[in-house]
Amino acid sequence: MGVRTTSKNAGPTGANSTPFVDGHLDKFYNSSFDRGGAGTNPEAARLGHEASGGAINVYTEPDGKIYRAHIFTASGTFAVTTASTNYPGVEYLVVGGGGAGGSISGQCGGGGAGGVATNMPGITNQDSVSLTRPAFPVSDGDSITVTIGAGGGGWNGGSPYSRLPGLPSKFGPTIEAFGGGAGGGGAAGEQFGKAGGCGGGGACSNPPSNGPGGYGNRDGAPNTQSGNPSGQPNSGFSQGRNGGNSGPYEAGFFGGGGGGAHSDGQNGGGAGGTGKGGDGLQIKIAGPTTATQPMGTPGPSPGGGYFAGGGGGGGNSGANPGDNSTAGAGGGGAGIGGGNSPTQNPPGTRGQSGQRSTGGGGGGVAYPLPGMHVRAGSGGSGIVIVRYQVGQTETSTAKATGGNISFYGGKTIHTFNTSSTFVTPAPFSETCEYVVIGGGGAGGFHNGGGGGAGGYTTGTTPISGSNTLTVTVAGGGANLIPGQPTNGIAPSGPPSGSSIPGSPSSWPGGTAGGGGGGAVENGQGANAPSPSPQGGSGGGAGRGYPGGANGGSAGSLGNAGGNSAPGGNTSTGAGGGGAGGAGENGQPTRGGSGGIGVQLPATFRDPKGGAGVPGPGGQAWWVAGGGGGCNQPPASPSSIPGGAGGYGPGQAVTPYAGGGMGGNQTGSDYNDPLAAQPGGMNTGGGGGAGTGPQSPEGRRNMGGNGGSGLVLIAYPT
């Protein structure tokens, strides 16, 4: 049976505001579903909830039951207009953000996965303990806030090294999945893994001091542990497992693996010790149990749908110094082994990050070379999925499969938030309209410029016959240390260069390249990366002290980043370019705003589908805005954020089109309310720029990650 989704159409509705929540763009997916008329079949006459929110996927199980899943990869609202008496309640999966891996010297621990809260039946951990929570009833008029926790940012220098846990995800006020604990770092007193939804792995330093793994939030687990006052309170339900202990500081050993939602992270040494991250859980809630799940990752059992895997621990050199520890199934990042030649992992190679929208923990790193800054893997962001049963009168059948499917304006729309395939059967013969958006570039930091938006392209292409077409949805650029190559190593000393660009999104109909990274201090914004003819927007210039600096140039699918402020001594950065206009130059008293984005074509302006975010005038369906440049006193007041993402020339306090707001100097914490904000998920927005040195240990506030890309495909219903 084909993929099913709602068949009734609705006209455009007003947009909603989009504040940032817990490090992610808070966008309300106004996804209302009207009821169809009753038929003569009693089962067909049964109706499900009339509800809105998130990206929608409606699917049929082998037993004939039809479910509607609301998938939230960014914060929003699940709103129930009318609750069903035929199919009461909802089932849910809530996953917190993953913790970062440990960094700096030593065998560092893997980050713990985000905790898992679910009432799906039959879900158990490695001890066969049921994780299934009670039923969740809903009523007419319920408006349930959904919060998506950001993953902890992997660090690259300074102290403390085991600092950045994931943030919690929530479904209403009562269902909370805690963020994962950060992995232990290599400095004295920092070797223990942090507690969290799943515990971070322990680390070991030289001189030797082995660190224990952090506690996961298990039923009956202590609230705190020795040396770790930040343990999460017990939830009353098991959420995750413990991190592994570090092995001794010897060749061939690893830091402990981060805990996963299903199993503990492995110890980093001794009999059977490999530093592997603990496995996550397979929860098939977003799609039919007989098909590959549209969300989650592959794992030991077929069908994907794994979430909350722990990050692998970092290694020491040994007989096989290129060996890496393994991440747990469910989106965790691999830890990195030591090495001593260019053909192996160089000492200090960065840990892999957890995958977005899985809650996976970040990978730990190995010992660094002298004078190197080393970055641990960041944790993956969390996710919330809500589903309920609906009747046959509320569905229609699509002609193709792939992505999340909706019907609007006589068209069938496939929305790809993650990489997948678009599959057409032999009778298929349609002219498909499409939009492809590349990943946004990261914002720079230390008086940086905003990241450039990913490339934006739209068009039509004929498709006939049986095809399995690869759809690649890009990730946004990571907010790495300025001047740091993609292997994660950078020389110490004054900052220079630019942050990491976004990646290209593609399908056979078209490709859109990533946006350029924002510059740092006196650096020039990065040009749009290759492929140049399809490149996105350029990154914004840094403050340009002592002289001026230029914004990055654009490819054919974007616009240039802004230049530094005149005068050369103003502590403000320029905005990154947007798909609809160039980034604003840095201003004498404020950061430049990111270049304006574009509004999706009319075909894709479906209020039920969830694509795009608000733009100028509060209108919805905008994408690919540039990241805002930074502010820093005394050039600008400390009470206002930096340049507005995606706004175009002028000043604002809220972002447009998925561009991240630039940061301002108010405090030392990475999670400061005026810290740089990331580009919006699935908008291709550029990340906002960070400000100058803040904390006693000399850290520099980080720029925001670039927003991930998007692919939309439509054809006549």
Predicted features along the sequence, with ranges:
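Low-complexity, glycine/proline-biased repetitive segments and flexible coils/loops
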Residues: 2-717
